[in-house]
Amino acid sequence: MKVVLKLRADGAGMAIFALPLTDTEHLFVKHLAVGYHYPVLSNIEFSIKGGQKVVITGFNGIGKSTLLITLIGEIPSMQGRFKFSDQVTIGYFEQDLEWQEPELTPIQIVANAYPDMVTKDVRKHLARCGISSKHAMQAIGTLSGGEQAKVKMCLLTLTPCNFLIMDEPTNHLDVQAKEALKTALSTFAGTVLLVSHEEAFYRDWAQRVINIEKK
C-alpha cells in the first residue's frame, strides 16, 4: 500500500494526511547488531505494528542514527535480521543538513526532485511547510538550519509512504515549527519510528518509547 502525505501549514496548522493502515506487524527486528567496522549496538529486538508511533531514545553517540540507516538499507546489518511488511513504503527524514549542490534554491531542489511539478505547485508545497517566498529563492546553503529542515520536510511530504522514519527532526526547528510537527505526527494515520532526545516533543503522542541504553 502506498500513501501520499500532504503537509499543510496554514491557519489550521500543519497536518499529515494518510490512509488508514491495518494493525499487522510492519517491522520485525531480531538479535540485530549494527555498526560500521564493529557493532555499536547489538542484540536489538522489537516489533512495530501498523499505525503505531514509536520513539527510540538513548545518549548521544550510542548508535541510534546507525540503527536507522541500517533499517533503511544504507548500510548492512552486522548480525541478526529485520524485516518490513510487504505493504510498507518508507519515508525517511535524516538529521544531517547536507546538500549535494548547496548553491541551489529550495525551488530548484524541489523542482529537480519532481520535474513534472509546475513552479506554482513547487512554491505552494514549500509555503505549506513554512518556507517564505524570500527563502524559497535563496541558496539552500545560506539558509538557517531550521529553514533547511523545512525544505527536507517538504521533500518528505511529497514522497509516497506509509511508514515515517525520522532522525531527530526537531534539532533545527523553532518552537512554532516543533508544535506544528508534533500535531502532524500525532494525527498521522501511518506508522512512525522516531529518534528523539526531546521528551516534551513526543510524550503526548508516542505510544511506545524504546530506551536503547537498556538493550
What are these regions (language model features)?
Residues 2-26:
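ABC-family P-loop ATPase nucleotide-binding domain
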